[in-house]
Curated annotation (Swiss-Prot):
CDD domains, per the entry: IgC1_beta2m
The keyword Translocase belongs to this UniProt entry's keyword annotation: no
The protein, known as: Beta-2-microglobulin
Impact noted for substituting residue 96 to N: In AMYLD6; reduced stability; in contrast to the wild-type, the mutant aggregates into fibrils with classic amyloid-like properties under physiologic solvent conditions
Disease in which the protein is involved: Immunodeficiency 43: A disorder characterized by marked reduction in serum concentrations of immunoglobulins and albumin, and hypoproteinemia due to hypercatabolism. Patients may suffer from recurrent respiratory tract infections and severe skin disease. Amyloidosis, hereditary systemic 6: A form of hereditary systemic amyloidosis, a disorder characterized by amyloid deposition in multiple tissues resulting in a wide clinical spectrum. AMYLD6 is mainly characterized by gastrointestinal and cardiac symptoms. Neurologic involvement, sicca syndrome, and carpal tunnel syndrome may also be present. Inheritance is autosomal dominant.
GO molecular function: identical protein binding; MHC class II protein complex binding; peptide antigen binding; protein homodimerization activity; structural molecule activity
Consequence when changing residue 80 to V: Increases tendency towards amyloid formation
Chain's gene name: B2M
Cell location: Secreted; Cell surface
Outcome reported for the amino acid change (mutating residue 80 to G): Decreases tendency towards amyloid formation
Length: 119
């Protein structure tokens, strides 16, 4: 009986240790096709390498949250870090700015990465 209790405690301790590892997300913002003003495209925000899995991701147009956004299922890499892709259809113009805002437990404040139309 005491051996099974010891194994159960050991298992719980090892599981709780997994939660202690925190990794900051890497954020990449890019369009599916080269940017052309007035031409429909897709804006992508790829967030990877983060742990734990709880994360908030928003796509922004001129600092305002874009409502119609889709995303992939939460997936994990072989190192147990997580990744997601958020995307939306958009039509770039000369004056509009686009960005991705990410909030995660490893960040002291939400991180905003702007889309560079020349990338």
């Amino acid at each position: 009986m005491s051996r099974s209790v010891a194994l159960a405690v050991l298992a719980l301790l090892s599981l709780s240790g997994l939660e202690a590892i925190q990794r900051t997300p890497k954020i990449q913002v890019y369009s599916r096709h080269p940017a052309e003003n007035g031409k429909s495209n897709f804006l992508n925000c790829y967030v990877s390498g983060f742990h734990p899995s709880d994360i908030e991701v928003d796509l922004l147009k001129n600092g305002e949250r874009i409502e119609k956004v889709e995303h992939s299922d939460l997936s994990f890499s072989k190192d147990w870090s997580f990744y997601l892709l958020y995307y939306t259809e958009f039509t770039p113009t000369e004056k509009d700015e686009y960005a991705c805002r990410v909030n995660h437990v490893t960040l002291s404040q939400p991180k905003i990465v702007k889309w560079d139309r020349d990338m």
